[in-house]
Each structure stands twice: as structure tokens, then as C-alpha cells.
Amino acid sequence: MDQMMMGAMSKDMMSMPGMQAMDMSVMQACMDACSACEQACTVCSTQMMSCAPACMNCADMCNTMMRAMMRMQGMNPATMMSMLDACMAMCQMTMDECMEHADHSEVCKMCAQACKACMDACMAMKDMMMAMS
């Protein structure tokens, strides 16, 4: 998504009751990382059959996480924390699988890097949510 649309979306989300305390830059970074990881995993799944199932599952999880963050209003914080944990676990598994091929596959290397960035962003999101509670 382009910056103008994301800025407008963040502004709209900030107007929702209960969202004012949310650090939208952390949330936006997590959504961006999930989107990038979804794309990298989708590309990787078409290139390396040995890691295709992990990559496809990770892409789906990242997409689900990103979409859930877009509609956080009314989301149970414990559920969101569990989803972030699941996303990080899926990214870790996929990163580990892709690292086995990273020395001879640039696609797997990029996928592993995207998974790591997504894990880091999900952890930052969790930290921010815990600080709010």
C-alpha cells in the first residue's frame, strides 16, 4: 500500500474508541512486515518445492495477522497476543527451513530475511500491547 493510503488508514484507525493509546507506527511496521513476508513466502513457495508447504502456510498466517491488525477494534487482547505468537512461530519455522537452502537460493535467503523481520515486528507489536495493559 502506498504511504498516503496507509497514513489515511492510520488516521481512521486512531479515531476508533480505544485505539488512541496504540502506537500506530509500531502497528504499521508490523503490518508492513507481515505483508512483505507474505509476498516473499509466496514467491519462495513457487521456487523451492522442498519448502513450499512451510512458505505457503507462513504466507497465509502473515496475511491473516495483517488483516486482523486492520480491524483491531473489538479484538480481545489475549487473542491478538496468541495470533502474534502463532505468526512468530510460523515465521521461525519457515525461516529455519529456508535457511537450509539460502546458500544456493537467493529466493530462500530473501524469504528467511522477511520472516526474521516479521518476527521482530510481531515482537515489537506484542511489547507495545503489553505496555498498554
Positions of PLM-derived features:
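Amphipathic alpha-helical hairpins
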Residues: 1-133
